[in-house]
Amino acid sequence: MVKSWLRMSKKMEAGTLLMLLMSNILLWENVASVPRHASGAGRGEMSLHGLLDHAIILAHNVTELIAEMNSVFLEDVLYKPGRWFPERDLTACHRSPFTIAVSKEGTQQRLGVFLVKEMIGMLETWTFSLYHIANEMSHMEEPPDEIISRAKNIEEKIKELMDVLKGILNKIQPGSPQNERFPMWNELAYLRSPDEERRHFAFTNLFQCLLQDSRKFDSKVRLLKCRLIYNRDC
């Protein structure tokens, strides 16, 4: 009788431990399933005005970071000219941003929706390009570590800005598709070129294009606020 009770007690204890173990596993799975940018989930509670102000701050910050990275790059070019071959003229960038014609008869909100989608698509192009710049530079004989670190940091900032823009798009047109595709930069294909001079020049060209686009992007975020909040162009 006593032995039977002990066996039953041990089985109950084992069952309890198993349940606790399963509960912990499920808890960890739930934690692991939280999106990487879960902090952005709270932006759904922000007002449109608040999201736009946040986007303006982030865009300006990204523009400054890109300008700083470009300065570091040009300094590296100055002291290591044989690495980058900067004497060649720049080729055309992937496309001047925000040049697609939009009907003037559309409402400011419709124009705003179009502009947000364009900006999201453009940022996707930037993140793709920055990733490949950092990746290819890391395989150089003497990797420019500071430039690589800055490129990765800017990539993360851009992802945060994209998150805010998607929040804005959801405010002004809920359920709208977000994938307005931008063509990739032509120079990306040359980052893996067997021609060392061509490959290194591609970096120079990409940095210049990124700098030009970031300055235009900064002003367009401010224009977006004018269209959506004040119903006019500033």
Swiss-Prot record:
Signal sequence segment: 1-33
Pfam families (UniProt xref): Hormone_1
Q: Print the keywords alphabetically.
A: Disulfide bond, Glycoprotein, Hormone, Secreted, Signal
- Which subcellular locations apply to this protein? Secreted
Keyword DNA-binding listed: no
Q: Which GO terms describe its cellular component?
A: extracellular space
SUPFAM superfamilies linked to this entry: 4-helical cytokines
UniProt main location, coarse: secreted
Tell me which residues are glycosylated. 61
An example Gene Ontology molecular-function term: hormone activity
What is one process in the GO biological process aspect for this record?
Answer: cell surface receptor signaling pathway
> Which cysteines bridge via disulfide bonds?
93-209, 226-234
Concerning PANTHER family, the annotation shows: PROLACTIN-6A1, SOMATOTROPIN,PROLACTIN
Give the record's family classification: Belongs to the somatotropin/prolactin family.
* Protein name as annotated: Prolactin-6A1
